[in-house]
UniProtKB/Swiss-Prot annotation:
This is Acetaldehyde dehydrogenase 2. Gene3D superfamilies: Dihydrodipicolinate Reductase, domain 2, NAD(P)-binding Rossmann-like Domain. The active site is at C133. NAD(+) binds at S15, G16, N17, I18, S164, A165, G166, P167, G168, T169, R170, A171, N172, N291. The keyword NAD applies.
Amino acid sequence: MQTHDGKTAVAIIGSGNIGTDLMVKILRHGKHLRMGAFVGIDPESDGLKRAERMGVPTVSTGIEGLLSHPDFGSIGFVFDATSAGAHARHEQLLRPHGVRVIDLTPAAIGPFVVPAVNIEQHLDAPNVNMVTCGGQATIPMVAAVSRVVPVEYAEIVASISSRSAGPGTRANIDEFTETTSNAIVRVGGAQRGKAIIILNPAEPPLIMRDTVYCLVPGHADRQAIVESVERMASAVAAYVPGYRLKQTVQFDEFKGRMPQETGSAQAPRLKVSVFLEVEGAGHYLPSYAGNLDIMTSAALATAERIAARQPVAA
């Protein structure tokens, strides 16, 4: 639903790190979006207080307060930045109202969306899931390899600063691995996938670092893989400026067996290794929190793309 200025009003549920950073991004950079409501459950939270200072309508009674808010009818999008468990309930309550839902939890009720890979396939979905921070960073690389050559197995390792992992992130650790592993297959195109997350306690905090391993046929065109990876990195950096390749793509011959394989060793294969780092934009969160920045940036890019298709009110 759009106003005379052509912008769609949105609500954000979740006043923690991710929700607050997303709010700041929309206020500063929203092209087709404007803040309609910022929703939390703790009136003393930094996020709700910051929203009030920035002139954003706030709700401190959770989704029930949002649904009863006098301006709820003008809301076109709801971003859910709470937890996987809470999102299932939120989705049930929101669905009858017909608002579009952008899910930043690992609940995965709607289809997985990684903007650089598959956003055009899900522009009409009522609920889209942003996978996980590790998924947003690494699945584009798996997809970049799989569009050139079949990927038998892909494994991602996401290392994030422990300081950037708030209560929501820690509560969702188990869902992180399951959701990301599923998305490596369903979005990345790998035949099998595995995800590992590391909370790095180092001080001073280190920025997000990700490693992507893909197992491909030994005859794969290495140059084509490199070029595809570099193109994909540029596509992601278009909406996450701090996203970059840490070094050149690495290739190693792999002649052994995977843990689940039996019988004699397979024909020689290649292990493709891609090394990434993600530096945050520093809108609300420190620059080392690239894991949170990539989630909010991907969610914003997704909603902007969907909103851009909607007719402008006269």
